From Swiss-Prot:
Listed HAMAP family: MurB (MF_00037)
Cystine bridges: none
GO CC terms: cytosol
EC number: 1.3.1.98
Pfam families cross-referenced by the UniProt entry: FAD_binding_4, MurB_C
UniProt organism field: Streptococcus thermophilus (strain ATCC BAA-491 / LMD-9)
Name of this chain's protein: UDP-N-acetylenolpyruvoylglucosamine reductase
Gene Ontology biological process terms from the UniProt entry: cell division; cell wall organization; peptidoglycan biosynthetic process; regulation of cell shape
InterPro entries in UniProt: FAD-bd_PCMH, FAD-bd_PCMH-like_sf, FAD-bd_PCMH_sub1, FAD-bd_PCMH_sub2, MurB, MurB_C, MurB_C_sf, Oxid_FAD_bind_N
Swiss-Prot/TrEMBL cofactor(s): FAD
Gene3D superfamilies: 3.30.465.10, UDP-N-acetylenolpyruvoylglucosamine reductase, C-terminal domain (3.90.78.10), Uridine Diphospho-n-acetylenolpyruvylglucosamine Reductase, domain 2 (3.30.43.10)
Length: 304
């Protein structure tokens, strides 16, 4: 970006929190990721729209990083604008419906539902990430998923406009939604829940959290579950059968606690993650004949 355009950015986007050449590993769950040219934290939809329209006007690429939980940002970073929704985190309850902005913490949203004795969101009680990412990926666990409770979502189009998509038009599948094809970005989502008993809801959330603590390597940085569940199999079991628990490349290893996770144990890099993912796919294929498909998203530029 030239000096004139930089001056225009500071003038047009005055008042918006924008950081230049900001290392993204400070914000990702994996603790890896190179710099973003411009990292923006809009406080509301108006600021978000200003950022997107400025970027489009100057042909600057832009993307929303969300909560950065189920993704890997490459070591070369991301060109253009990276937008984070940390400040777009409102949660509201209206009757049996919960509406949350895209940056709202998923776990916090389940706690709000519990506080109001609303049932249906318990499955997400321990899933890290944001509402936006959860809808984008159709997050789920223990028999529940976002598709079961979503009513509608407001999305930001590539032009910077906002429109509403009904749940029936989201084309949900296993860890999939139509947004992965359209490139539109979740702004907020509305969920339909049912009245329940507060103590029972709280007990179920605590039970699921306890299961996660027992099974998942929460003590290390990670990107969550790395692979989708292959039909008729469990990814973690296939990885164990290939004797890959504890298998390590650089600072990243297959968790010894849960083989479906890869953890950053010693200043690992995005390249370590990518190399380990590729190695695990190859060795599981050789051992079982099953080709694992990554669930985690990998974005950004490789380091030259």
């Amino acid at each position: 970006m030239g000096i004139n355009m930089l001056d225009e950015l500071k003038e047009d986007l005055v008042g918006i929190d924008i950081r230049f050449d900001e290392p993204l590993k400070r914000y990702t769950y994996t603790k890896v990721g190179g710099p973003a040219d411009y990292l923006a934290f809009p406080r509301n939809r108006y600021e978000l729209s200003r950022i997107v329209k400025f970027a489009n006007k100057h042909n600057i690429p832009w993307m929303v990083l969300g909560n950065a939980s189920n993704l890997i940002v490459r070591d070369g970073g991301i060109r253009g604008f990276v937008i984070m929704f940390d400040k777009l985190n409102g949660i509201a309850v209206n009757g049996y419906q919960v509406e949350a902005e895209a940056g709202a913490n998923l776990i916090a949203t389940t706690k709000v539902a519990c506080f109001h004795s609303l049932t249906g969101f318990e499955f997400a009680a321990g899933i890290p990430g944001s509402i936006g990412g959860a809808v984008f990926m159709n997050a789920g666990a223990y028999g529940g998923e976002i598709a079961h409770i979503l009513v509608s979502a407001q999305v930001l189009t590539k032009d910077g406009d906002i429109r509403t998509i009904d749940a029936r038009d989201m084309r949900f599948g296993y860890r999939r939604s139509v947004l992965q094809e359209t490139g539109e970005v979740i702004i907020s989502a509305k969920f339909n829940l049912k009245p329940g008993d507060y103590e029972q809801i709280k007990h179920e959330m605590n039970r699921l959290n306890h299961l996660r603590e027992l099974k998942q390597p929460l003590e290390y940085p990670s990107c969550g579950s790395v692979f989708k569940r292959p039909p008729g199999h469990f990814a973690g079991q296939l990885i164990m059968e290939a004797n890959l628990k504890g298998h390590r490349i650089g600072g990243v290893e297959v968790s010894t606690k849960h083989a479906g996770f890869m953890v950053n144990v010693d200043q690992g890099t995005a390249k370590d993650y990518e190399d380990l993912i590729a190695d695990v796919i190859a060795k599981v294929k050789e051992n079982s004949g099953v080709t694992l498909e990554p669930e985690v998203r990998i974005i950004g530029d490789k380091l030259n």
